[in-house]
């Protein structure tokens, strides 16, 4: 039975509230120096990139097609750069880079509701209060010299859907993701026009002095979390050039796509280059209860080229070998096609994709039955997947967090890494 988090952590403040509040006291303009990659090191730090296809992408129209069957639908399966492996014809660009990917076709998450499935997919278990993968990685891979936030999530404008159902859990405010809406910088990063530079500096000094006196009297997690998050807000402000996509070449903008998902992925690449440990990009509207084949075609058309471009870009820049990539939804879709041409929610047998750091490229793990209703070989759970993602980043997934004298397992002790997927 998992241990409960320290009671002190129940006071963890909202990271977004801190950022907005702190930003009003910070003063700086956009800096003139160009975007720079993280400092070169003998051994590049591991990073995480997650694509969350929110709503439930259909495994039958993406990674595990069943053409010519009663459940397969109208689309063909096409050959890929991996001999003998076929994926849906809706992913022609991805088919050309399959030799870089590892496809898992045997995930059984057992959950088929948006809210619980989104949380469990990201946390690797159904028990509430645990950190999502990105927050866990930000904690477990952090370095003393880190000044930027460890985990950033990029949503589309207009809605975050169910993707807000992750978070840092008992790790507290310091590891909450910075949530961006579109490819714009966080709101209120600039000093307010009514606050002078002198006033801003004074506010900063008072804040630091007050915080230090408070911490000397009473050591509490929220105080340290506030101070750290304030400093990270300031560091983000000083790196506003990260968000300036006008620095990207016309060719790159075209390759990634001028749609919002393409531009968000360009920003994700820039965040990784700047040294952010974990970046998650969300892609919406995969929930196809009606007209499934139309909507999956529309969503795949936008995702396919951008995703394939991003992976090739990481490889060409030498970043893929130290960046672990996960492509997932919160669940799959039913093999049965209903009378409205839709597919419902399905957690029993569906697919995810991995690439990059720690993963054996060019492989398919597991299989489903001919009708896609059940896992046939090598079933894995969400807990196993969480262990595997951590292990691919060189993290001991059997370890525990030590917080305020209590321990919490990093990953579900009842699960384990899938060694066959690990390089």
What are these regions (language model features)?
Residues 1-423:
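Ligand-binding pockets and gating/stacking loops
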């Amino acid at each position: 039975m998992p241990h409960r988090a320290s009671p002190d952590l129940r006071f963890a403040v909202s990271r977004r509230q801190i950022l907005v509040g702190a930003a009003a006291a910070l003063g700086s303009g956009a800096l003139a120096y160009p975007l720079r990659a993280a400092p070169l090191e003998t051994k590049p730090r591991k990073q995480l990139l997650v694509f969350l296809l929110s709503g439930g992408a259909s495994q039958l129209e993406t990674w595990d097609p069943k053409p010519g069957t009663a459940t397969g639908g109208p689309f063909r399966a096409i050959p890929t750069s991996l001999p003998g492996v076929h994926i849906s014809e809706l992913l022609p660009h991805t088919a050309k880079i399959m030799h870089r990917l590892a496809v898992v076709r045997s995930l059984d998450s057992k959950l088929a509701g948006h809210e619980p499935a989104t949380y469990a997919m990201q946390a690797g278990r159904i028990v509430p209060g645990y950190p999502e993968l990105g927050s866990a990685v930000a904690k477990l891979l952090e370095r003393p010299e880190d000044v930027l936030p460890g985990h950033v999530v990029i949503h589309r404008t207009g809605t975050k859907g169910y993707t807000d159902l992750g978070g840092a859990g008992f790790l507290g405010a310091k590891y909450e993701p910075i949530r961006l809406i579109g490819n714009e910088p966080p709101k209120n990063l600039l000093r307010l026009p009514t606050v002078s530079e002198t006033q801003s500096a004074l506010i900063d000094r008072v804040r630091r002095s007050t915080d230090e006196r408070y911490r000397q009297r009473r050591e509490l997690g929220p105080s340290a979390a506030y101070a750290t998050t304030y400093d990270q807000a300031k560091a983000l402000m000083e790196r506003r050039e990260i968000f300036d996509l006008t620095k990207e070449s016309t060719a790159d903008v075209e390759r990634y796509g001028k749609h919002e998902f393409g531009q968000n992925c360009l920003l994700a690449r820039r965040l990784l280059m700047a040294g952010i440990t974990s970046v998650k990009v969300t892609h919406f509207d995969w929930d196809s209860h009606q007209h499934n084949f139309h909507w999956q075609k529309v969503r795949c058309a936008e995702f396919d080229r951008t995703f394939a471009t991003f992976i090739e870009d990481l490889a060409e820049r030498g970043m893929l070998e130290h960046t672990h990539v996960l492509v997932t939804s919160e669940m799959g879709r039913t093999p049965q096609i209903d009378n409205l041409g839709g597919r419902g929610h399905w957690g029993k047998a569906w697919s995810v994709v991995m690439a990059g750091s720690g993963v054996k490229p060019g492989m398919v793990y597991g299989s489903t039955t001919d009708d896609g209703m059940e896992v046939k070989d090598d079933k894995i759970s969400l807990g196993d997947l969480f262990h595997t993602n951590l292990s691919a980043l060189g993290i001991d997934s059997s370890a525990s967090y030590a917080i305020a004298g209590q321990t919490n397992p990093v990953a579900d002790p009842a699960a384990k890494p899938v060694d066959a997927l690990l390089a």
